[in-house]
Amino acid sequence: MLKDIHQHRILILDFGSQYAQLIARRVREIGVYCELMPCDIDEETIRDFNPHGIILSGGPETVTLSHTLRAPAFIFEIGCPVLGICYGMQTMAYQLGGKVNRTAKAEFGHAQLRVLNPAFLFDGIEDQVSPQGEPLLDVWMSHGDIVSELPPGFEATACTDNSPLAAMADFKRRFFGLQFHPEVTHTPQGHRILAHFVIHICQCIPNWTTKHIIEDSIRDIQEKVGKEQVIVGLSGGVDSAVTATLVRKAIGDQLVCVLVDTGLLRLNEVDEVLNVFQKHLGAKVICVDAKDRFMKALKGISDPEEKRKIAGEQFIRVFEEQAKKLNVKWLGQGTIYPDVIESAKTKTGKGHIIKTHHNVGGLPLNMELKLIEPLRELFKDEVRKLGLELGLPADLIYRHPFPGPGLAIRILGEVNAEYINILKQADAIFIEELKKSDYYHQVSQAFAVFMPLKSVGVKGDARHYGYIIALRAVKTVDFMTAQWADLPHEFLSKVSHRIVNEIKEVSRVVYDMTNKPPATIEWE
């Protein structure tokens, strides 16, 4: 019997927290579907979503200022359990009649939480026990405000040395507040606390499992497309691979795979992709030579957003042309949830576009093909779990992500054939050395970036002006936040030496040591 994987659902309202997407991932790990929406979303959307519980995220602002963000007032009147985290707790307390003040001593980092009332959220959870027999928890704090007076109906359920009201609860209305962050790994029992809220308080049934997601996706694809054919664009990445595999599992030979050789793929990538997909999918793969087409469309374009949109439009036009030849009506795409989040804007304009993904905001409005996006609700780690469950090879599943527009957005400014050739060689050297040194799977994504600037160097006995290559490697779980990878200096020196000596046009190599945020993973 097929499960309704969306029947039980949690809504997360985002107040601008760097951890908001992490909350969503934790809820998904518990086995319950959730969605992340901006805190200023309209009432109708929330009511249509019909959540079993609502989580208010943290945020960078202070509740004590009149113009700061507030939770929609009606959510406290609909009988739905609410959990406020950090800023979410503070705004809930303030909006329901409590008081919030700036603290004399901000709390950042580890703190020991003393549980005063373990009912519901903290039931059976402890890291240690105090001499008085009270449960103690190691938690992660990051706040400059505190709830100084509880709202009517609430009681303090936990405290720290610096926060007398570190957790609060109105058990009758099922409203809970946590001043700490249960979603981060620095709060070891955080997963269990969130599970208590989602499973026991909100009474959600954990149907969001890999097996059920696959079943639901197959059923959805079959219902949408019927007997019609679907065309799926292959890129060599995990997203398009899992998309193609799901579609093939759903409709068999109705799937047609298309690999567009844009000229912007990595060195030897076309041959590698064709080999992998024909071997493991057994599907028909059409390779379209579109190098001249993409280069012509990108000529003179230096703006990153324009490059992304042009790439998106050219991809769609190629697929439409192939679809007409084959009488195909559907396009399958590997859009994933972070693509949707990063490309979204709130209706009030408070959200900001970080970048447009070529398969989300970069699609032309007059597109003739109908879209099917089976991964649209999934984070990257969920996509990889699906791929393994579907039997795809681990080397493909854990291959580093590659952007749809390809090397066009790893070349700063205008794209031309010379720059592409230089970047392909530099990137291949970097990846080759990562694999030889067993660092490839220790980082989540690594690549080279071409900078169209010339820097002076010395080759032989002569001065030499050459281009600059930047190397980027990051570690991340969900690609929503990332840390730069602290690779050994000896390794970076070896890569730099090879690039400068093997690519005559390059005179300098630099390494990017910026986290996300403030930077994005890609340079453009």
Curated annotation (Swiss-Prot):
EC number: 6.3.5.2
Matches recorded under InterPro entries: Class_I_gatase-like, GATASE, GMP_synth_C, GMP_synth_GATase, GMP_synthase, GMPS_ATP_PPase_dom, NAD/GMP_synthase, Rossmann-like_a/b/a_fold
Residue sites binding ATP per the record: 235-241
Claim: Hydrolase is one of the keywords in the record: no
One Pfam match: GMP_synt_C
Catalytic reactions of this protein: XMP + L-glutamine + ATP + H2O = GMP + L-glutamate + AMP + diphosphate + 2 H(+)
Domain annotation Glutamine amidotransferase type-1: ranges: 9-207
Keywords from the UniProt entry: ATP-binding, Glutamine amidotransferase, GMP biosynthesis, Ligase, Nucleotide-binding, Purine biosynthesis
Active site residues of this protein: 86, 181, 183
Pathway named in the protein's UniProt entry: Purine metabolism; GMP biosynthesis; GMP from XMP (L-Gln route): step 1/1
A GO cellular-component term linked to this record: cytosol
A molecular function (GO) term: GMP synthase activity
Residue span, GMPS ATP-PPase domain: 208-399
PANTHER family named among the record's database cross-references: GMP SYNTHASE [GLUTAMINE-HYDROLYZING], GMP SYNTHASE-RELATED
Biological role stated in the UniProt entry: Catalyzes the synthesis of GMP from XMP.
Protein name: GMP synthase [glutamine-hydrolyzing]
